[in-house]
Amino acid sequence: MKRVLAIILGGGAGTRLYPLTKMRAKPAVPLAGKYRLIDIPISNCINSNINKMYVLTQFNSASLNRHLSQTYNLSAGFGQGFVEVLAAQQTPESPSWFEGTADAVRKYQWLFQEWDVDEYLILSGDQLYRMDYSLFINHHRSTGADLTVAALPVDAKQAEAFGLMRTDEDGRILEFREKPKGDSLLEMAVDTSRFGLSAESAKERPYLASMGIYVFSRDTLFDLLHQNPTHKDFGKEVIPEALQRGDRLKSYVFDDYWEDIGTIGAFYEANLALTQQPTPPFSFYDAEFPIYTRPRYLPPSKLVDSQITDSIIGEGSILKSCSIHHSVLGVRSRVEDEVVLQDSLLMGSDFFESSSERAVLRERGGIPLGVGKGTTVKRAILDKNARIGSNVTIVNKDHVEEADRPEHGFYIRNGIVVVVKNASIPDGTVI
């Protein structure tokens, strides 16, 4: 795997994940209490023995840069390993921003070409899954493909949201359609049992969806980008073009948990699914294939007379006499007496506040970090460093689906209340 370079696409402005992307790039959005989205593809690469990685971003990349530089020093073992962020930049040849996935790679192809590698692994920075890329790349090599696309078997309902592939029995891609509907969708069905699915599973999931993960052979990638300078997107333009001109395209079927965390609803569900018993769909408890993140050296969490069920609590948290059910709490979370948290995601804090600091804040009419006394929070996301006052109710009482209240420090997306980073919600507020 030393002859593979990974390119992780950080995504655009992250409008579908707004307001979580208000102050950070999409790959830097916190996940599962202590990780960030970018930790998933990077950990998959490290576990697959791929140690050369570039992360392409163009929006709010400060916290992402900080996280990566503090977490991944892959050259310490005297190899050539690195994780480097490449932000969109203007040059005389390309005065514009990244205009799509393929355009982002094209703008930096001068840098990627300098590396003496055989394959380029193109990954997405906003997906939750565990995958051994070495199997994927070996499949690409053994089939003699020019381009291999990772494919996920899906049912008809899910299929409408993806680019779909129709393949022959050897997995060679014959046709590619972007988000087909109706009869156009039915024509894309394939017998997925020949890719290792059981007969029952194959019947339920007869479509192969593109996961947005690709392996390109070196010459194929640069030739496609060079010959088609107006093509901006891999899925919509570059792959159909490669198919049309007769390149050898193969699919690699991945039949395991995979979730695209592109929207607030999907992000919320994916986080809370981690609390499922007895086995969550995705687990961070895997010694063979761990997910890495920044070591923070925090003390253990302290729970005082609390009732907690089906929840995940990040380290360095202090929970007083509260009731927490089916929730995920991030590092350094503070929850005071008589608080009820249900079906919620608290991202925690970036720093501690001492007891004396909290007392002084209260005296001056301020609100300390965390969730104040007597507050009820249901079906909500509280971003980092949120200060929720006492006797606050955050339950979306009017069952609003979408709302923007930036002046009050919150938004509602998919019926979920999202309190923004560093927001202060005064005592007695009802949302």
Curated annotation (Swiss-Prot):
The keyword Cytoplasm does not apply. GO terms for cellular component: carboxysome. One of its GO terms (biological process) is glycogen biosynthetic process. Alpha-D-glucose 1-phosphate binds at residues 163, 178-179, 210. CDD domains: ADP_Glucose_PP (cd02508), LbH_G1P_AT_C (cd04651). InterPro entries: ADP-Glc_PPase, ADP_Glu_pyroP_CS, GlgC_bac, NTP_transferase_dom, Nucleotide-diphossugar_trans, Trimer_LpxA-like_sf. One of its GO terms (molecular function) is ATP binding. Pathway: Glycan biosynthesis; glycogen biosynthesis. Signal peptide: none annotated. It comes from the Bacteria. Its EC number is 2.7.7.27. Keywords: ATP-binding, Carbohydrate metabolism, Glycogen biosynthesis, Glycogen metabolism, Nucleotide-binding, Nucleotidyltransferase, Transferase. It holds the Pfam family LbH_GLGC. It catalyses: alpha-D-glucose 1-phosphate + ATP + H(+) = ADP-alpha-D-glucose + diphosphate. Involved in the biosynthesis of ADP-glucose, a building block required for the elongation reactions to produce glycogen. Catalyzes the reaction between ATP and alpha-D-glucose 1-phosphate (G1P) to produce pyrophosphate and ADP-Glc. HAMAP family: GlgC. Homotetramer. Belongs to the bacterial/plant glucose-1-phosphate adenylyltransferase family. This is Glucose-1-phosphate adenylyltransferase. It comes from Synechococcus sp. (strain WH7803).
